[in-house]
Regions:
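Bacterial N-terminal signal peptides
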Residues: 7-18
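Positively charged n-region of N-terminal signal peptides that target proteins for export
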Residues: 1-4
Length: 320
């Protein structure tokens, strides 16, 4: 594994194109996808490479800015994992048909005091558009295993599979806090402003998006992926209990538990309420508690690695 990732690092001296990210930042999604790609079987790697070539935006999006010395299959796979964020742009020609904003999250309520948020609908009804991440994953898995679905549609679904497995391992994509301060919910941390030890105040969701790294250059991503997968505490053996749970709902509930206990600190996390005016930062934002940032970094690294292993397992199972 370490040699494979090092080879990627040696071959590449370029950066990924800049992208807007809405879950893990671009680097986080690339970490998930690179860890997964290195664990694909030869048959699965060949299959996904052929499938992604059927993507209607293969040349214009998935191979955009690909340097000559980087394998097209690897590059397309990594960019595919960020494509559901790319297609959110109003300027993208497929925005109207392939942008599904509600697919990126499923907010199970974390209720404090008398506040009570709605419980999301878990079951997807075939023939309907999924209402949340959990329903979207059911549809995506069904489509990828359905011989009647056209390859170009499956290629788009593969992009979503990569992306949503990354998303659901970001704890704030599985929960929203409801309390006297947030009677309508904190929108997965977007309504809370926190103050890191170093840097400017940011909303809680953005803080967790960037908890692993903000460097999205491929050499940096490859180096960090090698570091993470070489960590004995993040090996498949060390994570075997979590990896024994193969159901997407289990993964979501795992993230939800992490969100309650570590992200929200069981409801004790100090923060300020985000003003209604976008981009305005309130005065006097309380600092994050001692040890919070170290806990966040350690937790986020673990979530990234689990997502990578699980994505590989999903794809290997489909393309045996």
């Amino acid at each position: 594994m370490r040699k494979c990732l090092a080879a990627v690092l040696i071959l590449t001296v370029c950066v990924f194109p800049a992208m807007t990210s809405f879950a893990w930042n671009a680097a986080g999604h690339e970490l998930v996808d690179l860890i997964a790609y290195q664990q694909l079987t030869p048959a699965a790697r060949l299959a996904v490479g052929e499938l992604l070539r059927q993507h209607p935006r293969y040349e214009k999006d998935l191979l955009a800015n690909k340097p000559e010395d980087v394998d097209a299959g690897l590059w397309a796979f990594l960019i595919a994992g960020t494509w559901p964020d790319v297609v959110r742009s109003q300027a993208h020609p497929m925005m109207q048909t392939e942008n599904h904003s509600v697919w990126h999250y499923v907010d199970y309520p974390f209720n404090l005091g008398t506040a009570e948020g709605p419980v999301p609908e878990e079951e997807w009804v075939p023939g309907t558009d999924p209402k949340n991440l959990l329903q979207a994953m059911t549809k995506i898995q069904a489509d990828l295993n359905d011989a009647a679905v056209k390859d170009y549609d499956k290629a788009i679904r593969l992009c979503w599979l990569e992306h949503l497995i990354g998303d659901l391992h970001q704890p704030l994509h599985t929960s929203a806090l409801f309390s006297d301060r947030f009677p309508q919910g904190d929108r997965g941390g977007n309504s809370q402003i926190v103050q890191p030890k170093n840097g400017k105040p940011v909303n809680l969701h953005f803080y967790w998006d960037s908890a692993v790294t903000t460097d999205a250059t491929l050499p940096a991503v490859a180096k960090l992926a090698a570091e993470l997968t070489a960590d004995p505490e993040l090996s498949r053996e060390a994570l075997k209990d979590e990896l024994s749970h193969g159901a997407v709902k289990d993964w979501v509930m795992e993230s939800y538990a992490v969100c309650k206990s570590i992200v929200y600190r069981d409801g004790t996390l100090p923060s300020s309420v985000a003003p209604a005016t976008r981009g305005v930062i309130p005065n006097g934002v309380p600092p994050l508690p001692e040890g919070y940032e170290a806990d966040a970094a350690k937790t986020a690294r673990r979530r990234i690695v689990l997502a990578g292993y699980r994505l590989a397992d999903q794809i290997n199972a489909i393309y045996k």
